Amino acid sequence: ENGLALEHDISNVKHFAQRGIVYITLCHNGDNDICDSARGCNTHNGVSSFGEKVIQEMNRLGIMVDLSHGGEKSFYDALDISQTPIVCSHSSSRALCDVPRNLTDDQMRALAAKGGVAHTTLYHGFLRTQGEATIIDAISHLEHAIDVMGIDHVGIGTDFDGDGGVR
């Protein structure tokens, strides 16, 4: 999680591919040299020129582009740049929980139109803004995503390694 591990060296995409990496989350909780984060400062106004090369190399090597944590402009830029479907490995619905990390309905529709998948996260702060998140909240996000995108474009991305979990 976070393309910062590429260390601004495009050859590291191949390095990681050769070691079995199947997807790279382009950014995390802040802008990096690849793209702007949902919690960033809009450093590049979306995907940077280096980020465009990274996405193209990921496509060439069969590594999935993951836009969880990406800012909205980064999301649409990556969707335009990528020649393969992208994923959002742990992103919920902004219509149900209004935080910048979650996907708008328009983003969900655009992702589905390009063959991508949005995985609803079980991280409590992205399921509800107040109170304790429950499995019912997670199901509501899944049902909403299915209604917007169709079931073929919806998955579950628990984020258990990033403090995910509901009661």
Which residues make up each language-model segment?
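Extended, charged catalytic domains and RNA/DNA-binding interfaces, predominantly
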Residues: 1-131, 138-146, 153
